Amino acid sequence: MGEEKRVFLGGTCNESLWRDKLIPMLKIDYFNPVVDDWTEECMIEERKQRAKCDFCLYVITPLMTGVYSIAEVIDDSNKRPNRTVFCFLDEDYVNAINKEGVLRKTFDYAQQKSLDQVGKMVERNGGKYYKTLAEVAEYLNNN
């Protein structure tokens, strides 16, 4: 019997809860690169995991502040297209509670169009593009 498949969980950090929602849906192993203190060693381990995982998943949400994950998904879709999976979620929630409750963040129309084009580019390169975590889990669990 072969080793269990493994997915690299790349994409939006910034206290986004997408990983917490996806992990219970997975029937395969995963590498979560989120750490409290990002160091050079963490970056080296992340590159190592991206290279050896069966799938490299990048989920982008409106809590994204940097753009490096976009570069990573395009890089992986060129270098490892059959292992690259991209998903962007239209909304995310800020963990902090304010007097109105949980703060919902969304992408504006131009950002949504741009991210849709990123997804289509990933597909043209041979990768997969999904719009929900349920679709992502379905693909990862069955391939």
Model-flagged regions — what are they?
Residues 1-143:
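Conserved catalytic or regulatory cores that recognize and/or transform ribose-phosphate-containing ligands
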